[in-house]
Regions:
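Sec-dependent N-terminal signal peptides
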Residues: 4-13
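N-terminal presequence-like segments and the immediate start of the first folded domain
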Residues: 16-100, 104-120, 128-182
Length: 182
């Protein structure tokens, strides 16, 4: 009886130690089915890294992704001020593209986007004219894309702010904090 109990206990521990999948679909496959591809992480233009992980141990950790912009697959950036050089819809598209670039940095840090437990915090910065007040409508491009890909795990706390300039005149810059499996 003691051997049976020991075997049961070992099987219970092994069974509990395995992580259940978070999604009933593959995140990257879903992105590919949308006609998109997760890019490689961008090379930083200064003395920083694209993403940093933080964990005090446990099942999950936080990943902080550096400010990222709307880099196209051709390697250029969408630039200009929303409400002057770009429409709200074009800014929305730039934020959506930035979401894809952020996933590239995130994948570079964690290896597998299926490890994403949830998006925690998003800070969206919009290069806009001083009187423009529709920054949330622009950053919705990011939020809508992330929720489309990750479902409810993509819902996040968010700030959307306007700035009179961004580095290299990019249209948007977005930072995120993401909880992932360790």
């Amino acid at each position: 009886m003691e051997k049976v109990f020991s075997l049961f206990f070992v099987l219970l521990i092994v069974g509990c130690a395995q992580n259940e999948p978070l999604y009933d679909y593959d995140i990257e496959k879903k992105i590919n089915e949308m006609g998109l591809k997760v890019p490689e992480p961008s090379t930083p233009i200064a003395n920083y890294v694209p993403a940093v992980s933080f964990s005090e141990s446990g099942k999950t950790k936080l990943v902080y992704v550096s400010g990222t912009g709307p880099k196209t697959k051709e390697g250029t950036y969408i630039t200009g001020k929303v409400d002057q050089d770009l429409t709200i819809e074009e800014g929305y598209g730039a934020a959506r593209l930035t979401a894809l670039n952020i996933l590239g940095s995130l994948k570079g840090e964690i290896g597998d986007l299926n490890k994403v437990v949830r998006f925690v915090k998003v800070i969206g910065m919009v290069n806009s004219t001083p009187n423009f007040n529709q920054q949330p409508a622009v950053i919705n491009g990011f939020s809508d894309f992330i929720v489309e890909v990750f479902g409810d795990r993509g819902r996040h706390a968010r700030s959307a702010v306007g700035l009179v300039s961004l580095p290299s005149d990019i249209a948007v810059e977005i930072e995120v904090v993401v909880e992932v499996l360790n």
